[in-house]
Swiss-Prot record:
<dbReference type="InterPro" id="IPR015590">
    <property type="entry name" value="Aldehyde_DH_dom"/>
</dbReference>
<dbReference type="InterPro" id="IPR016162">
    <property type="entry name" value="Ald_DH_N"/>
</dbReference>
<dbReference type="GO" id="GO:0050661">
    <property type="term" value="F:NADP binding"/>
</dbReference>
<keyword id="KW-0028">Amino-acid biosynthesis</keyword>
<dbReference type="GO" id="GO:0055129">
    <property type="term" value="P:L-proline biosynthetic process"/>
</dbReference>
<comment type="pathway">
    <text>Amino-acid biosynthesis; L-proline biosynthesis; L-glutamate 5-semialdehyde from L-glutamate: step 2/2.</text>
</comment>
<dbReference type="InterPro" id="IPR000965">
    <property type="entry name" value="GPR_dom"/>
</dbReference>
<dbReference type="InterPro" id="IPR020593">
    <property type="entry name" value="G-glutamylP_reductase_CS"/>
</dbReference>
<dbReference type="GO" id="GO:0004350">
    <property type="term" value="F:glutamate-5-semialdehyde dehydrogenase activity"/>
</dbReference>
<dbReference type="Pfam" id="PF00171">
    <property type="entry name" value="Aldedh"/>
</dbReference>
<protein>
    <recommendedName>
        <fullName>Gamma-glutamyl phosphate reductase</fullName>
        <ecNumber>1.2.1.41</ecNumber>
    </recommendedName>
</protein>
<keyword id="KW-0641">Proline biosynthesis</keyword>
<keyword id="KW-0521">NADP</keyword>
<dbReference type="GO" id="GO:0005737">
    <property type="term" value="C:cytoplasm"/>
</dbReference>
<keyword id="KW-0963">Cytoplasm</keyword>
<comment type="similarity">
    <text>Belongs to the gamma-glutamyl phosphate reductase family.</text>
</comment>
<dbReference type="InterPro" id="IPR016161">
    <property type="entry name" value="Ald_DH/histidinol_DH"/>
</dbReference>
Length: 447
């Protein structure tokens, strides 16, 4: 088993070298073939997904799978349409490989270019969500990265079906290296993959807090991702109530099972009387369970709103991924920011305010990869950010941060073009000086 896994990874690693130099035309042709194949084979995809949903129902009944994961697992006709649209959006994006990032003249006829290039071989490990396969494969293909996929057992039929359809489509177009995309399906394969740091350049895990933490703790391979999505909205005393009601409702209710839905609502005491009762009524009608601190519990109880429960200390650190919301009253914007930076996951947090100085203060102090002003946290998404799709959301402080599109799948190399220059001429008593002059030259124009 271990040797089979390693041979798959080595094959993908070799293919990554060839894939890095495949032309934009060939890559776009392969992407269009992928989109057409998904459309043609959608019936087979939906049938495979039904098998997974039946298995998932058994797992949920046994307490081994949450409703949030079951929701993410489901594939519908509209989701297939979304997969197809996502791939075609990637086709429209400019090929990022080989782009000149900067050009510096060191001396006459000694020019240094900084040029973008693929990372190499990327491992993507994910729970549920079969739509991850076309999303990530399209971005990795366009950015010239070979990819190893490992999905959860609950989505095995869907993942295998979609993966096979896409790989056959890619191979049918010609010009693409064989073996650039591989699929692993067993739990044992995960542990083997995590140990192959000699070949795998980056891991992108997508799943629960515990799942991502497990990956981070059991590999030497760099990991890009976030462990949880504990997102907040702070309703400032200078908020427009109508804006606050619609934004806060959307941020929780529109799709509660995802990582950019809010888990905690922070409300300034000076607007609580005006804002919170109607907001709570909207949430309760939508089936949201409200877990309130003492201040919000007292206010809402006096207004006759129910059912309500009291928040525990643990609630502030929980990612519910469900129709559950914690509510807390705060006295100042600083108290709100301190709460977010203490209990949040640095994913996406927002403020509702009409006050420019409050807005500026919040943006400057909150330590989040995305900050929303008078807009729903649900916008924190690669597709909505114009990236075509995303491989995930990162809360890392280095490399990529926030929704990661193709730019997060690239690094760069330095290329120095000279005419026989040697360092000895630029050292010692009579050393030639460097000019270090920025130039507006592109490496692709070099003869």
């Amino acid at each position: 088993m271990a040797n089979d896994i390693e041979s798959k990874v080595i094959k993908a690693k070799k293919a990554s070298i060839e894939l890095a130099s495949v032309s934009s035309e060939v890559k776009n042709r392969a992407l269009e073939a992928m989109a057409e194949a998904l459309d043609k084979e959608r019936k087979i995809i939906l049938e495979a997904n039904l098998k997974d949903l039946e298995y998932a129902a058994q797992l949920k009944k046994a307490g081994k799978l949450t409703q949030a994961l079951v929701d993410r697992l489901k594939v519908t006709d509209s989701k297939v349409d979304g997969m197809i649209a996502g791939i075609r959006d990637v086709i429209k994006l400019k090929d990022p490989v080989g782009e000149t990032l900067s050009t510096l003249e060191l001396d006459d006829d000694l020019i240094l270019y900084q040029v973008s290039c693929p990372i190499g071989l990327i491992g993507v490990i994910f729970e549920s969500r079969p739509d991850v396969v076309p999303q990530v494969m399209s971005l990795c293909l366009k950015s010239g990265n070979a990819t190893i996929f490992k999905g959860g057992s609950e989505a095995r039929e869907s993942n295998r079906t979609i993966f096979d359809i896409l790989v056959r489509a890619i191979e049918s177009t010609g010009g693409m290296p064989e073996g650039a995309f591989q699929l692993m399906e067993t739990r044992e394969e995960i542990m083997s993959l995590l140990s192959l740091d000699a070949y795998v350049d980056l891991l992108i895990p997508r799943g629960s807090n515990e799942f991502v933490k497990f990956i981070q703790d059991n590999t030497k391979i760099p990991v890009l991702g976030h462990t949880s999505g504990i997102c907040h909205i702070y309703v400032d005393e200078f908020a427009d109530p109508d804006t606050a009601w619609q934004v806060c409702f959307d941020a929780k209710v529109q799709y509660p099972a995802v990582c950019n839905a809010i888990e905690t609502l922070l409300v300034n005491r000076n607007i609580a009387e005006v804002f919170l009762p109607k907001m709570a009524e909207m949430y309760l009608k939508a089936g949201v369970e409200l877990r309130c601190d003492e201040g919000s519990y007292s206010l809402l109880s006096e207004k006759g709103l129910s059912p309500l429960s009291r928040a525990t200390d643990e609630d502030w650190s929980l990612e519910y991924n469900d129709l559950i919301l914690s509510i807390k009253l705060v006295d100042t914007i600083k108290e709100a920011v301190d709460h977010i930076n203490t209990f949040g996951s640095h994913h996406t947090d927002g403020i509702i305010t009409e006050n420019a100085s409050r807005r500026k203060e919040f943006i400057g102090l909150v330590d989040s990869s995305s900050v929303m002003v008078n807009a729903s946290t649900r916008f924190a998404d690669g597709y909505r950010y114009g990236k075509g799709a995303e491989v995930g959301i990162s809360t890392n402080k280095i490399h990529s941060r926030g929704p990661v599109g193709m730019e997060g799948l690239l690094i760069y190399k330095y290329i120095l073009m000279g005419k026989g220059q040697v360092v000895a001429d630029y050292a010692g008593k009579n050393a030639k000086p460097y000019t270090h002059r920025k130039l507006d030259l592109k490496f692709e124009d070099v003869n």
